C-alpha cells in the first residue's frame, strides 16, 4: 500500500482518477462525493446532493465535470 486516506462515513463504492491532475474522486454510502488530491493527501472538496448511496463517479475526460450515479435513481453532472 502506498498510502491510505480516510474521510468517508461508510463504504466507498466508486473511485476514478483524473487523467492529468493528481486527483481522484470517490463516492459511497454516505451519499457524498469527495475530490481528493493524492499528492497533498487531503480532501479538496465535498459535493452533496444525492439522497442515497453513490455507486459510480467519474471525471469527464475533457470538461471540468464529474458525473455521478446514485441509488436515488439520479445521474448528476457536477461542474467543478
Q: What do the PLM-derived regions correspond to, one by one?
A:
Residues 2-7, 14, 27, 43-49, ...:
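Short C-terminal beta-strands that terminate individual repeats in beta-propeller domains
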Residues 4-5, 16, 36, 78:
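Short hydrophobic/aromatic-rich motifs at helix boundaries and adjacent loops
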Residues 18-20, 60-62:
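Structural WD40 beta-propeller signal
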Residues 38-41, 80:
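Short loop/turn segments that connect beta-strands within beta-propeller blades
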Amino acid at each position: 500500500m502506498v498510502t491510505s486516506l480516510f474521510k468517508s462515513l461508510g463504504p466507498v463504492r466508486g473511485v476514478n482518477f483524473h487523467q492529468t491532475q493528481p486527483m481522484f474522486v470517490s463516492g459511497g454510502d454516505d451519499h457524498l462525493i469527495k475530490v481528493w488530491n493524492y499528492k497533498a493527501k487531503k480532501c479538496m472538496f465535498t459535493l452533496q446532493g444525492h439522497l442515497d448511496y453513490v455507486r459510480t463517479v467519474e471525471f469527464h475526460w475533457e470538461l471540468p465535470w464529474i458525473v455521478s450515479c446514485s441509488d436515488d435513481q439520479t445521474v448528476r453532472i457536477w461542474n467543478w
